[in-house]
Amino acid sequence: MTGLLASRLRAEGARSPTKGTDIPMRQPSAEDLDAAHQLVSSARGGRDNVMNFRSDRQEMTGKALDNTQGDGSRNMDSQLQNGHKAPVEQRAGESPPESGANPIDHPTSSKKSPKAQSKEQAFTGHSCSNCGTKRTPLWRRSPTGATICNACGLYLKARNTDRPTHRSRSLLTPYGSSSAQTLDKSRSSTSPTNDGNDPRLTDTWSNYAVKECTPSGSCPGGGSCNGTGGAEGCDGCPAYNNRVYKSAARNAMALHTPRTSPQVSTQGGPGSTEGDAGSSNPETMTLHIACQNCQTTVTPLWRRDENGHPICNACGLYHKLHGAYRPPTMKKSIIKRRKRVVPAMREQSPPSATQSSNGSVSPEASPAALAHNHDSHRQYQNVEHGNGHPPPHTRPLYSHAYHAPPPADFTGYTSNVISLPHHPPSTSQQLRPYDNNHNNGETTNTHRAPMPALHNPKKRTISESSIEDSQRPQASQILTHIPQINPPTPPSSSSASFPNNNPGRFNSISSLLNHPGEAATVTAHDRDDSRVDPALSSAVAPRTQQPQQEHQHASAGSHSPPRFSPSLSPAPPSTTAVPVGGGSGSGAAAVAGVVDHRDAKAERRARLQREAQDMREALKAKERELALLE
């Protein structure tokens, strides 16, 4: 292997002066080439020859490669002049493959110049045919097939014209101004792509910039716009905002434009600021972009024609619909805007807020008026009530007097008392489970209305439901002081004390299943019947009380046989008063309930008999009709 390396080095040293036979003689076979590469890399510390295929890339790059070679030769000449020629020749003698692969006329070169040239060829030698750049995130093709960069391609696609290579534009130059010609000449002389001889390349945009002669702040408003502002809703007007944006951008460019002029800079001293003073002189006014067709400066949207010239929205739409340019006679000084444009909310003074609340302003100011009314309404609520608690944010537009409906829990229905005209509630039963104003089991009357008088008691919050659950056992303990209806049966009285404290509700399910007591049941139904319409009590009472009546007589046994007399006289039930009530006051109430029950049952029986008789007569009439039809 050592002999092979020595022979290869001698062969390369012998053919190094010649450049044409370098590549064919260096690769006799693939095995020899691999072995030589391994030996060279191991002997020289793993250094690779980056210029082995430079000749191949030279054929692919063409004209772009010639420019890079010229740059490399200039860099090499500068290095030779600085005294680096001797070290370069020594390094070239030590590495014959690098010297043999160098396509430049000079046989020796430094190691830094090939690396710099390889970085310049990162995109395989592509260059933009419009601006000449060699670096871009995306290479594009022009309609003619030329290679262009991403910026030039997007510019051409959007404006249908080539992207200008010089970025200095005299957009703030009035017509017929001598300073404009001076700035154009100075700018064209400093541009790398314009030598000042071609008048078409000076700046085409300066032809579309006109002087603004309309006084600012004279917009009539109300849907009409002249682009000057000063009216209600001008902050949200697209024509006004577009015009302000364009003028601000051009004023910023005007501050930096005269500084690049060599004529202005050579004047020296105070004369060097004449360009800035001239551009900011109020006599020249603000310059805006103008339409190529009608020369207007006010439009909600700037468009471009097929030549890339800026045109207003009206001319662009007219050309798009009719295929011809819009006649200049159709130009109007005021633009009619649609009502769908929402203006920006501006701070209003108190008089304007008063007008907006009365609805006397234009529709454009309605959003700002609503916002101001909303704030004033919230302030009025805080001042009027003076409680230091602002209204909830979820309902800012409702009156503060409207309270949220309390929770509706029908399981605690017995703890609430319904106030009726003929049955006023007692003071001991006025319990407020939703109030926190009870101390040691004692209740106090508050100003809050009962729950059934509220508007929408269907929803409740989590806090209110938790308060209700915590207060429900206390309410059940307070109700235990109600006097018992049937003293001889303590279990029934204790179980019936809670569900019967509210006369407006039937017994609970537990009391119906466990049959708490005869007298208690009759008394409850008696009070229920007194609250029901008399016309309906006779129909409802027998259905609900018939099973209880049978249970009552079964429990009485042989003490009193049941009597079903249609008579309305209260004398016969006196025989049953002693066994049921035991001679107490509760027994008298039970007797009255039995009498009412018998009277209702008799009325029910008589009505059923009448209905049955009517049905029989109707059936006979239908049978006669059938007989006649047959």
From Swiss-Prot:
Q: Where is this region: Cystein-rich region (CRR)?
A: 219-237
Q: Where is the composition biased (Basic and acidic residues)?
A: 595-609
Annotated consequence of substituting C291A: In gzf2; decreases both the number of zinc and iron ions bound and the ability to bind DNA
User: What's a GO cellular component annotated to this UniProt protein?
Assistant: nucleus
Q: Where in the cell is it found?
A: Nucleus
Biased-composition ranges, Polar residues, are: 66-82, 115-133, 175-196, 258-267, 349-363, 504-513
Q: Which organism is it from?
A: Ajellomyces capsulatus (Darling's disease fungus)
In a knockout, what does one observe?
A: Impairs the repression of siderophore biosynthesis and utilization genes in the presence of abundant iron and thus produces siderophores even under iron-replete conditions.
Please give a single GO biological process term from the UniProt record.
positive regulation of transcription by RNA polymerase II
Q: Which GO terms describe its molecular function?
A: DNA-binding transcription factor activity, RNA polymerase II-specific; RNA polymerase II cis-regulatory region sequence-specific DNA binding; zinc ion binding
State if RNA-binding is listed as a keyword. Answer: no
- Gene from which the chain derives: SRE1
List the coiled-coil residues: 595-630
SMART domains with a match to the protein in the record: ZnF_GATA
What is the recorded phenotype of mutating C131A?
Answer: In gzf1; decreases both the number of zinc and iron ions bound and the ability to bind DNA
Region: Disordered, residue numbers = 1-139, 162-203, 256-283, 339-609
Keywords, alphabetical: Coiled coil, Metal-binding, Nucleus, Repeat, Transcription, Transcription regulation, Zinc, Zinc-finger
Q: What is known of its domains?
A: The conserved cystein-rich region (CRR) localized between the zinc fingers is also involved in DNA-binding and transcription repressor activity.
Function (record text): GATA-type transcription repressor that regulates iron- acquisition genes through specific binding the GATA sequence element 5'-(G/A)ATC(T/A)GATAA-3' of target promoters in an iron- and zinc-dependent manner. Regulation occurs via direct binding of iron ions. Iron acquisition regulation is critical for survival under both iron-limiting conditions (to acquire essential iron) and iron-replete conditions (to limit iron toxicity).
Question: Could you tell me the superkingdom of the organism this chain comes from?
Answer: Eukaryota
Protein name according to UniProt: GATA-type transcription factor SRE1
* Keyword Nucleus appears in the UniProt entry: yes
Induction annotation: Constitutively expressed in high-iron medium, whereas expression is reduced approximately 2.5-fold when an iron chelator, such as deferoxamine, is added to the growth medium.
Q: Where are the zinc fingers (GATA-type)?
A: 128-152, 291-315
- For bias type Low complexity, the affected ranges are 436-447, 492-503, 558-568
UniProt xrefs under InterPro entries: Transcription_factor_GATA (IPR039355), Znf_GATA (IPR000679), Znf_NHR/GATA (IPR013088)
